[in-house]
Amino acid sequence: MNVYYEQDADLGRLQGKNIAVLGYGSQGHAHALNLKDSGMNVCVGLRPDSSSCAKAREAGLRVEPVADAVKWADIVMVLLPDQTQKAVYEAEIAPNMVAGNTLAFGHGFNIHYNQIVPPADVDVIMIAPKSPGHLVRRTYTEGNGVPCLIAVHQDATGEAKKTALAWAKGIGGTKAGVIETNFKDETETDLFGEQAVLCGGSAELIKAGFETLVEAGYPEELAYFECMHELKLIVDLYYEGGLSRMNYSVSDTAEYGGMTRGPRLITSAVKAEMKKVLEEVQDGRFAREFIDECNGGYKNLNRLREENSGHAIEKVGAKLRNMMSWLVRK
């Protein structure tokens, strides 16, 4: 894969351009503020009734309704929730873009699954920091950055990649490294990771471990500590140095037990199911299911949220976290 750094990107590609960042959430605020501090002409596009309007203005940013921001801009970055992007695009973005504009995304979902089909005369790019927005902002203010992905879906002007690299540099990404990919690979790996490991697989593993201990007669408090609370300690080791760092850092007892018992839990049958999950991402079944869920008022999602919030691990966890001074919110 191609990896780019500071010397490979030219901020001059953005200078003199009008830049609209749509959304002011985790990623939106980081992109807008970092680009502003890099000397760019930035406007944030929001609904007039959005609670984020005041926050953005207090941070020194210009704020306009989405349609006005798009009409003014040469480059439009869409950092809105996946499920709202299509409607906003059709009502407020598409009617106000002109030939030669750049349409940018932080995630490839709507382009890859054809929910948004831009006209052929605009550039379509992606700049996706591989960190939450607060870290994108913090590392930038410290003079550093986080790794980013870039991709070009459509290059009408012949300059799309240069624009993507310049944007990545403007938010600090080239100080860490910018990896070139494509919308398909970014979207499919991102969704699979969320479903099979990060949000789906890990949550179910935690609940199954907790339930196993409680059903065997152990106190819920101990089960919580062993299966939920201490997971952060292990994940931090993975994050810092991979699997080897974790194995080096834990006791020999833990290392041996993990290496000999772990494969009994994550079996070939589990991997086979992971492949099915990946197939549903690849062929669009998950995307269609999620879109139908959104259009249907989130009935299934709301039911699942309620079921999860009522799980015993949530109740005992809330009680135990109140004992942890570093977690208690004032």
From Swiss-Prot:
Q: Does Repressor count among this protein's keywords?
A: no
User: Which InterPro entries has this protein been placed in?
Assistant: 6-PGluconate_DH-like_C_sf, KARI, KARI_C, KARI_N, KARI_prok, NAD(P)-bd_dom_sf
In this protein, which residues make up the domain named KARI C-terminal knotted? 182-327
Binding residues for Mg(2+) 1, per the UniProt record? D190, E194
User: Cofactor stoichiometry and binding?
Assistant: Binds 2 magnesium ions per subunit.
Gene3D superfamilies to which the protein is assigned, alphabetical = 6.10.240.10, NAD(P)-binding Rossmann-like Domain
Q: Which residues form the active site?
A: H107
Listed binding positions for NADP(+) are Y24, G25, S26, Q27, R47, S50, S52, D82, Q83, T84, Q85, G133
Q: What is its EC number?
A: 1.1.1.86
Task: State where substrate binds.
Answer: S251
Provide the cofactor list for this protein: Mg(2+)
A GO molecular function held by the record: magnesium ion binding
Give, as in the UniProt entry, the pathway in which the protein acts.
Amino-acid biosynthesis; L-isoleucine biosynthesis; L-isoleucine from 2-oxobutanoate: step 2/4; Amino-acid biosynthesis; L-valine biosynthesis; L-valine from pyruvate: step 2/4
Residue limits of the KARI N-terminal Rossmann domain? 1-181
Which reaction(s) are listed as its catalytic activity? (2R)-2,3-dihydroxy-3-methylbutanoate + NADP(+) = (2S)-2-acetolactate + NADPH + H(+); (2R,3R)-2,3-dihydroxy-3-methylpentanoate + NADP(+) = (S)-2-ethyl-2-hydroxy-3-oxobutanoate + NADPH + H(+)
Residue positions annotated to bind Mg(2+) 2 are D190, E226, E230
GO CC term (a single one) = cytosol
Question: Keywords in UniProt for this one?
Answer: Amino-acid biosynthesis, Branched-chain amino acid biosynthesis, Magnesium, Metal-binding, NADP, Oxidoreductase
GO BP terms, alphabetized: isoleucine biosynthetic process; L-valine biosynthetic process
Q: Which family does it belong to?
A: Belongs to the ketol-acid reductoisomerase family.
Q: What is its biological role?
A: Involved in the biosynthesis of branched-chain amino acids (BCAA). Catalyzes an alkyl-migration followed by a ketol-acid reduction of (S)-2-acetolactate (S2AL) to yield (R)-2,3-dihydroxy-isovalerate. In the isomerase reaction, S2AL is rearranged via a Mg-dependent methyl migration to produce 3-hydroxy-3-methyl-2-ketobutyrate (HMKB). In the reductase reaction, this 2-ketoacid undergoes a metal-dependent reduction by NADPH to yield (R)-2,3-dihydroxy-isovalerate.
The cross-references to HAMAP family, in alphabetical order and at most eight, read: IlvC
PANTHER family (alphabetical): KETOL-ACID REDUCTOISOMERASE, MITOCHONDRIAL (PTHR21371:SF1)
Protein name listed in UniProt: Ketol-acid reductoisomerase (NADP(+))
List the source organism: Chlorobium luteolum (strain DSM 273 / BCRC 81028 / 2530)
